[in-house]
Amino acid sequence: MMTQSIRRSMLTVMATLPLLFSSATLHAQANSVQQQLEALEKSSGGRLGVALINTADNSQILYLADERFAMCSTSKVMAAAAVLKQSESDKHLLNQRVEIKASDLVNYNPIAEKHVNGTMTLAELGAGALQYSDNTAMNKLIAHLGGPDKVTAFARSLGDETFRLDRTEPTLNSAIPGDPRDTTTPLAMAQTLKNLTLGKALAETQRAQLVTWLKGNTTGSASIRAGLPKCWVVGDKTGSGDYGTTNDIAVIWPENHAPLVLVTYFTQPEQKAESRRDVLAAAAKIVTHGF
């Protein structure tokens, strides 16, 4: 009886002061999330950046979201999107074939190495770069666009003044602390990823192709996806580099909720540090709790 009375009293207070209660609750929840992310970062021994956008109301959860981090292979999303943008005015572009030579191969080429002395279409290169993180595929996309600066120019055309791509694979993964090359911020990347996959940055056909590629990613099972309910749909792009840099950027479709856009960037002090995908999974679990 006493429990029921307490519940009725709480409901009365909530009904009488909904705005005050809601504001206090949200503030407490936000503080809890920040504290959990801070504790995660401290225990990991590295630097963690997180940006989550809830597209239901455009609210955000941010942690070091305005600090620069090396993008590593998450930059492949921008290069692939730039080619998709070109295809809006050239319907045959994605079928254009690109020669693959043995001398093109770099340090990680799971798809391109199967096509040495042959060709791949730009569509195949886009899929290889995004779904298998093929570095030769990324370099071919960059070459087609005219160089890293053209990828940056595409970002600027979207209103992203933060993204910068300076090098090709694999040197763009050096992730030297304090080096601004090949970096962005979690918030800038989250906003751009939202525009590319859920907004109007690309025409519908091209937007759908980008989302399809991201949903088909094969490299993200231990990163953001590992921190989410199995029934949620995820499209993501991972990245890794020196200094134990471990990244993942994702569009997430929870059950019965508007999409979420989540960027998790993590780096460490030692150049030879191991990747920490578990940190990204833990961060994803923290910021998506309650959705």
Curated annotation (Swiss-Prot):
Note: The class A beta-lactamase family has a specific amino-acid numbering system, sometimes called Ambler or ABL numbering and often misspelt as Amber. A multiple sequence alignment was used to derive a consensus sequence and then the consensus was numbered taking into account insertions and deletions. This allows use of identical numbers, e.g. for active site residues, despite differences in protein length. UniProt always uses natural numbering of residues, hence there appear to be differences in numbering between this entry and some papers.
Keywords from the UniProt entry: Antibiotic resistance, Hydrolase, Plasmid, Signal
Family (UniProt): Belongs to the class-A beta-lactamase family.
EC number(s) per entry: 3.5.2.6
A GO MF term: beta-lactamase activity
Lineage: Bacteria, Pseudomonadati, Pseudomonadota, Gammaproteobacteria, Enterobacterales
Keyword Lipoprotein among record annotations: no
First-tier enzyme category under EC: hydrolase
Reaction equations catalysed: a beta-lactam + H2O = a substituted beta-amino acid
Keyword Hydrolase: yes
Binding site for substrate: 237-239
GO biological process, alphabetically ordered: beta-lactam antibiotic catabolic process; response to antibiotic
Coiled-coil segments: none
This protein's name: Beta-lactamase CTX-M-5
Record InterPro entries: Beta-lactam/transpept-like (IPR012338), Beta-lactam_cat (IPR045155), Beta-lactam_class-A (IPR000871), Beta-lactam_class-A_AS (IPR023650)
Cysteine-cysteine disulfides: none
Record-annotated membrane-spanning stretches: none
Domain of life: Bacteria
Catalytic machinery residues: 73 (acyl-ester intermediate)
Function: Has cefotaxime-hydrolyzing activity.
Region forming the signal peptide: 1-28
One Pfam family in the UniProt entry: Beta-lactamase2
